[in-house]
């Protein structure tokens, strides 16, 4: 449901995703992979999420985790904190998800620093106000990209994470990876639905090249 201000409300139905069994996840699924991204809604099936995380680690993959929704965090908070202790290389959260995880109100940069305290990269997205990215003592405020018209925020967080991962896995700095994430998120919200139109990708790829 999209309101005139471009904001969306979703009631999630996971469908066939909830029928997947941990036994269906095998080392062969990660052959040749160097990174595994775990999307938060998988955490409604904790046994499957455990198998994905453990198998990815055994295959030598780095791991990123997208918290996806404060509702996900409310259900899977213990699992998330346990995985952070084990070691998650990159965590993506927005302000509501970080608040639910740490169960306190704090400044957005404080959430990023606390997440980074687990040893990985923390990306705390704050919508139209940009994001904070932290790793150890390294800390960056990622500026938002202005948009001509806000149409639909569905998928913006995923686009941001996708841009960041694309940059990071190709060796870009944290700041440059965050800038690419911000650009993809900004492009996403200007279109109805979560997909960025094909004709926009040459410009976005050129931006990624320019950031290297």
Question: Model-found features: residue ranges?
Answer:
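Short beta-strands and strand-loop turn motifs
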Residues: 11-12, 33-41, 61-68, 92-95
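Residue-level structural signal for beta-strand termini and adjacent loop
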Residues: 14, 144-145
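Conserved phosphate/ATP/ADP-binding segment of small-molecule kinases
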Residues: 53-62, 68-141
């Amino acid at each position: 449901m999209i309101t005139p201000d471009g904001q969306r409300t979703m009631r999630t139905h996971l469908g066939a995703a909830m029928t997947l069994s941990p036994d269906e996840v095998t080392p062969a699924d990660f052959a040749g992979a160097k990174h595994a991204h775990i999307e938060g809604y998988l955490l409604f099936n904790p046994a499957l999420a455990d198998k994905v995380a453990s198998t990815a680690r055994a295959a030598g993959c780095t791991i990123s985790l997208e918290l996806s929704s404060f509702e996900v965090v409310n259900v899977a908070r213990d699992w998330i904190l346990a995985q952070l202790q084990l070691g998650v290389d990159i965590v993506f959260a927005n302000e509501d998800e970080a608040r639910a995880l740490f169960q306190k109100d704090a400044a957005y940069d404080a959430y990023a620093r606390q997440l980074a305290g687990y040893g990985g990269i923390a990306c705390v997205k704050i919508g139209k106000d940009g994001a904070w990215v932290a790793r150890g003592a390294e800390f960056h405020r990622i500026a938002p990209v202005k948009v001509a018209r806000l149409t639909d925020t569905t998928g913006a967080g995923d686009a941001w994470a996708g841009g960041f991962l694309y940059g990071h896995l190709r060796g870009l700095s944290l700041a440059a990876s965050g800038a690419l994430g911000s650009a993809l998120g900004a492009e996403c919200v200007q279109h109805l639905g979560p997909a960025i139109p094909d004709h926009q990708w040459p410009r976005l790829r050129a931006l990624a090249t320019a950031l290297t």
